[in-house]
Amino acid sequence: WEETLLILPRGGKPSILVGNEGIGYIAVSPVEMNIEFYQTFSLMGQPNDARSRRLEEILKDAIALQSGKLGVIGFKSYDPALHTIGAFVTDVPHYIIQTLERIVPAQLLKNATDLLADCEYGLKHHVSAKEIVLYELTGTRVSRGVLNCLQKLRPGMSELEASRNCLFDGAAANMHPNINFGDKNLSLGLASPTDAKRLQLGELVGAGFGKRGCLVHKIGMYVE
């Protein structure tokens, strides 16, 4: 529901900035960190008062850098050659970048998202044996749910009715269900199931959903 900013120094204790909701959750973390209450990360309409320091003041205390590089991690990496705004391209909110540039030289900022998310060497591709087992288990459960949904399709059934056959449970999801009938609904790409659309013979059918570690989606034509 709100943003969080983690600052990892080369040496010393990490710092984390959390909003109104995060301040209640951070206490359960086993990692020793400097916790900073920063209400600007909270939802609009929630309290944002004098209990929070200004961002520049917080970052000055947490960052001491005059040489080397300061890695900024957002959602994606970008090839500077494809842009016209210089070597540093990031999707981290502009007000955070502007504040950082008041503390450290702008030329020291670098998009470091690739360290986590690069498709070849990013940390997300280095998984433990336990994680491999969990992903395999999740893949089996999701694929069986999609298969069960397809096997129980009947003419006149709504997309919403069909979605109930996906064997959902409370495991963490990475996307909403996509159960769609007919050219129009399938063409929407990632549409949620509706109660209005009813299945007819000869129609295209798409069925899929995802849980943490796996996503399965199948498309075919419904025939007897």
What do the predicted segments below correspond to?
Residues W1, V104, K110-H126, M157-E224:
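Short catalytic-site patches enriched in acidic/histidine residues
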Residues W1-E3, K13, L65-K69, G202:
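A general structural motif
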Residues W1-R53, K197:
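N-terminal accessory/capping or targeting/presequence segment of soluble
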Residues L5, Y95-T99, G202:
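Acidic, His- and aromatic-enriched active-site or binding-groove loops in soluble protein domains
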Residues L43, P47-M175:
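Flexible, acidic/His-enriched mid-domain "rim/lid" segments that flank
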